[in-house]
Each structure stands twice: as structure tokens, then as C-alpha cells.
Amino acid sequence: RVSRGLGDVYKRQTYNSFDQIESPSKIGETQLHALNLDWKRFVTHQTADFIHHEIAALREGGSTLPTTANLMHYFGGLDYFKIAKEIDVVSWDTYPTWHKEAVIDTAYDNGMCHDLMRSLKGKPFFQMESCPTSTNWQSVSKLKKPGMLFAQSMQAIAHGGEGALYFQIRQSRGASEKFHGAVIDHYGGNDTRVFKEVSRVGETLKEIRELAGTTVNSSVAMLYDWDSQWAMEDSQGPRNKGLHYLEAMLKFYRGFRKQGVNVDVIDMTCELDKYQVLALPMVYMFKEGFAKKIRSFVENGGTLITSYWSGIADDTDRCYLEGTPHGPVSYTHLRAHETLANL
């Protein structure tokens, strides 16, 4: 059973017990995709367990303050849906690369991540960090044009955020972040353009304080599955220059947002009853429990939208037999006969 789960005795690698399994490494085994996937799941489990016990120690010491952690964009190392279960409030570090591409494209990407952060716990989040001017770690750290800081802060609030905070307040004089942007720069005055724009954000937040505690109602749910992303990133074929999972998600997301439709970004544990539309971009990996939810959703009148490279493998990354797409996406009444990879 262990060998089957790791890839059907691939190249004579038969496992007779769990004691024989080593973690993926440059001096170990890297070709068993199921093993690589389980290792990433294990890392998330260990991190969530660590957070759980750290918070427990604080609670035993008498602290009742809410807990949070600085999450980061679409970080590939941890499944944030599992991490979010251990903390009270979701917050994330928001560093979009404004002015490197069309502003609207950057806004869509940043907006989708806001919606992910809101959806992790289904309640308001915090923009924990944002740069008032320019960072010092991006390949080209472009200065925010006048008004962009205000627009970025209001975007966070519009997507269900309850705070627009900064890193950093006062610019360091030395060390690695001395050129990272701040509310108060090396000049030190309060008469700079940036300081005035930060003040404008603060005054506006006071004016709209009644929005605190409100929620965003979405009729559309879009699946973001870390397991599928990990498995596709590890895949050898059909395209080894990247399968572009997040780009596929953004194509769906742009379509909804252009119509003014709010989107929740969900995982496979989420209930689907309140949604009218379910979007499944590149749902490479199907888990049977979620398959039953989708079947019920469609049978009760919900609209299902999916894409290419869906319903390919089970949760051990073993390919389904008898054709793809497998599972509820077969409601499309389509079957993939061949796969053509584009350049």
C-alpha cells in the first residue's frame, strides 16, 4: 500500500515500511511526486502545529490578545488555509509592483490576494505591511506615483480589510533596510508628499469607520488548491517551463471583476451552499469529499466553470484511468483525447 501511494513501485523502488522512506533532498529521493507532495503537506502541518503550541503558551500565561501572522502574497511554501485555522486574525504583507505593468493588471493580482486573505477565515483581514514609497528588495524598486498609496490602501478596505498599515514608520539610518521606504524618511519632516498622503489615508479611515466589522458578500467562489499547485509545479510534463496556475486563476478573476462581481477564494473544505457560481481553474487534483460537494452544487442549480488540465490525478498524484477530466468536471461532457503543450 505504501509503494502504491508513492507511485506504483516506480523503477523498482518498493517500500515495505514507512521506516524506509526518506524526505526529499538532493542526496535522497526526488522523483516520487507523491512523496514530494506529502513532504510539503508535512511542512504545513508542522508549522501549524508549532503556531498552535506557541499560542497555547501565551494563553496559559494569561494573554487574551488576538493572534496573527504576517502572511505573504501567494506564498508557495505553506497551505495558508491550514495556517489560518490557528490564528485569530489574518494579516498579510502587501507589496504590489506598481508601475511595472499596466496598473489594472497589478490591481487585479493584488485584489485577488486580498480576496484570498479575507476568505481564509471568512472575515475581515489586515493589510499588515505596505510600503509608503518604494521598497529596497524588488529588482527595480519603483516609487509610488502620487495617489497610488491612497488607492492601494483603499483597495484593501474595499476588499474587506480593516486596516492599512505600513512598514516602516521611520526610515532606518543603517543596515539592510536603510533604503526601504517609510512614512518618515531620513529628512525627518512632516511636510513631505508621502507624509501628507499617509495622513490622508488616516483621515479617510476615520470618515469610513462605520465599515469596520462589515463583510463582503460574494456570489462566486473560486478554488485555490495548494495541493494542486504543488503537484503541478513538481510535474514533469506536459510543459516544463511552468503550467502557470496563478495566471489561469487571474484570467478567471479578471472576468468576474470586470462585471463587478465579488469573488471568494476557497479551498476544498469550504461549503458551497451560498454561492451561485463555482470556478475551478486547473483543478488538477480531485479529492473525493470535494467531488461530492460539486456534484450536489450542480444538481441544485449551481453554475460550474472549469478549465483545461482539470481532473487529472487523485490526492496521491496518481493519474485517473478511463479518461479525463475525471470527477464532477465530467459534467461538461468533454473528454481530452490528446494534450498539446504551447510554447
What are these language model-derived features?
Residues 13, 17-18, 52, 64, ...:
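Carbohydrate-binding surfaces of carbohydrate-active enzymes
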